[in-house]
Amino acid sequence: MKFSPLLDEMMKALQVLPGVGPKSAQRMAFTLLERERSGGLRLAQLLNRALTEIGHCSHCRTFTENALCEICANPKREESGLLCVVESPADVAAIEHTGQFSGRYFVLMGHLSPLDGIGPEELGLEILEQRLKAESISELILATNPTIEGDATAWYIADMARAAGVKVSRIAHGVPVGGELELVDGTTLSHSLMGRQPLN
């Protein structure tokens, strides 16, 4: 069915969001126009402001509207000596949500993917290399995704860390808590067996 050209444009624009197809976009557009016009206007203003004002932390490259994000600006985070390398700001949020990490981060904004033209320069690895040499980092924790590209990126960075004399580790991968072994795929189970931990 054809709608007004502006409504069609609105629905197409909503489809840039992950998981939003034509039907979801139509439902969102109709909801905003029928019942949530004030909420829609507020959303439009905040989107405009966020897309204009939010940039990257000059130290770790996560999202912030300031020169330094709150984590990098916190001197207690530096005291731990831990630096965790992740692929995206969403990974920072996930790790922070656990409450188990008190160090700092470096956000790659992706992973090595030569076929897509993503090399060390695009990931800011020269900045990371400078940090490894200049800062007092006791351990570099590699928390890239457990994919072929994520593993390749982790190995590349591990070589950099070793060359700088920094201890390096990789987050564990394996069977999820509450998972049943018969339902776990072979690759995950292999990682679990290779990364097993002693019970003390």
Curated annotation (Swiss-Prot):
Family annotation (NCBIfam families): recR (TIGR00615)
Protein name: Recombination protein RecR
Primary role: May play a role in DNA repair. It seems to be involved in an RecBC-independent recombinational process of DNA repair. It may act with RecF and RecO.
SMART domains xrefs: TOPRIM
Top-rank taxon: Bacteria
GO terms of biological process kind: DNA recombination; DNA repair
GO molecular function, one term: zinc ion binding
Family affiliation: Belongs to the RecR family.
Zn finger intervals (C4-type): 57-72
Annotated organism of origin: Aeromonas salmonicida (strain A449)
Keywords noted in UniProt: DNA damage, DNA recombination, DNA repair, Metal-binding, Zinc, Zinc-finger
Annotated ranges, domain Toprim: 81-176
